[in-house]
Amino acid sequence: MEKLLDRIDSPADLKKLQVSELTKLAEEIRQEMITVLSKCGGHLGPNLGVVELTLALHYVFDVPRDHFVFDVSHQAYVHKLITGRKNRFHTIRQHGGISGFMSREESEYDCYGAGHAGTALSAALGMAVARDRRGGKEHVIALCGDAAFTCGITFEALNNVASTTQRLIVILNDNEWSIDKNVGAIASYFNKIVTNPAYSYLRDRVEKVLEKWPGKNVLKVARKAEEAFKSLLWPSVIFEELGLTYHGPIDGHDIARLISTFEFLKNQEYPVLLHVITQKGRGFPPALEKQKKFHGLGPYNPITGETPSSPRKTFSEVFAETMIKLADMNRNVVAITAAMPNGTALDKFQPKFPDRYFDVGIAEEHAVIFAAGMATKGFKPYCAIYSTFLQRAYDPIIHDVCLQKLPVVFCLDRGGLSGDDGPTHHGLFDVAYLRTVPNITIMHPKDEDELADMLFTAMHHPGPVAIRYPRGSGSGVAVKERPELIPIGRAEVIKHGRDVAIFSLGIMVEMGKELAQKLEECGYSAALINPRTVKPFDRGTLEFFARSVDLIVSIEDHVLAGGFGSLILEELQALGLRIPVVRIGWPDKFIEHGKVDILRKKYGITVENALEQSLKILKHPKSDTNLEIA
């Protein structure tokens, strides 16, 4: 029997279906996502929750003429399935396949790329104003999760809507979750709207009465009646005060009602906000039971939802376990996260120290300034934020923390290549954007045990500290029961050598070990150095080896521009030393999504490439090369 989904290659095909057929199509799409993502992983829960909403939008509006701007856009899988990418859906988040986020390069239906939260409303407003200025008629719809409303950028845009356009539709997709349960006053406010029994009762009664009225204007009357009752109960609805007409909340899984609502809203000449209630993980019991886990995950059993376990602890888990130890040692230690307790593993810290744990929502700037404020009163804030998200707080890092020399510890999870999530999530710029800032100490551990030592050392340091560590599991080394202090600004010489000095940053020490072995097999004695701290840098160790070897190799999981290798070149220049330098790192481009090993091979972040480049110089020291020369 042919599936309805088999007939959908574009939104035009979707419009050929009867409204009554869309429920069956929704079921087929859910099953397709459950099956495909069980093999490759992805953001399953959020996408299961927006099936009906996405179908209704495409049924009423006309993309690519009209524009759907998804906040974060990790919930755009259904959109991709019905906009010509169905036959490539099995490649999602795989190298060479379609992205797990909206991508302007991928499809004309993706009007705006994203990956971080809070951008949709600003972008949609910009599109709407551009449309107005050229006299266009297309619709612009911003799809924002409720978590996006904990992000200050969203409210900056809301503050600007009424004064700049009269035609904009904002959809608030309310499932009470981002990656973790939403927090703060905004989340409580949404819940108050949804659960107000008087409002729900009156709304339902009015609808039942009006359903019996004849005439074409009944829908308009119904809407006005609903708004009248709402205004009685909610005289100061925040969105109304900001100039958007509020509609809802409505059931985000009722396709017929969604379609009728969109048909009504598309004809209105005022900015509107539609509050839609959806269920994250709908249609897959394991995803409903464990919404946090199924927000985004790797391969899983499509029947039970079980995922394979790793025998090794992740760096995030070691971070959380160490934080618990530090909190036991020092009552002034506090932990701060920006809506990522699960991703940073601070959900393990929270039950033990609930009064010393703070989830501030998707608000990285606020998180950093909040930490700075606590630091002025003697507390030791550890601010755990993904490397890619800390970019959003660059000004507070400089202005509020480093300028005042406050002892805030930035714990940069996902430092380095992130993998399947792609360019919006790789943490490849942090060394470059942090090492230019005065007063900050930057550390990068080679393994799990050294991470624990660095966290402990940071507790005793009187100024700002950034500790960068990667996603996923480490090498499996044992972590000491009690961490130890490490000397800030002093490198660890793992192995001495006469011909080559390999400076490997962080987890790239493992690659450095392999390179040293390969060079030894080729007859060259190689030293291996673990820098430990990028800032302050151990210039003395660099000078010692620069005066005694024929080649320096730097290896980093970071862009070359402004990164660790650049630092080595700068230091050699300052020392007045000339020596060939081979730099291994990421090129000056945004790195696509894919498995880490595949991407490293493609871009030459391999032992083989490092060996080849090194031997070119060692065998022909006087020849011209394209390698970096200090």
UniProtKB/Swiss-Prot annotation:
Transmembrane intervals: none
SMART domains reported in the protein's UniProt record: Transket_pyr
Catalytic reactions on record: D-glyceraldehyde 3-phosphate + pyruvate + H(+) = 1-deoxy-D-xylulose 5-phosphate + CO2
Enzyme Commission number, as recorded: 2.2.1.7
Keyword Cell division: no
Amino acids binding thiamine diphosphate: 74, 115-117, 147-148, 175, 284, 364
Pathway, per record: Metabolic intermediate biosynthesis; 1-deoxy-D-xylulose 5-phosphate biosynthesis; 1-deoxy-D-xylulose 5-phosphate from D-glyceraldehyde 3-phosphate and pyruvate: step 1/1
Pfam family, any one: Transket_pyr
Superkingdom of origin: Bacteria
NCBIfam families: dxs, PRK05444.2-2
Protein's job: Catalyzes the acyloin condensation reaction between C atoms 2 and 3 of pyruvate and glyceraldehyde 3-phosphate to yield 1-deoxy-D-xylulose-5-phosphate (DXP).
Protein name: 1-deoxy-D-xylulose-5-phosphate synthase
Species of provenance: Methylacidiphilum infernorum (isolate V4) (Methylokorus infernorum (strain V4))
Lineage: Bacteria, Pseudomonadati, Verrucomicrobiota, Methylacidiphilae, Methylacidiphilales
Gene responsible for this protein: dxs
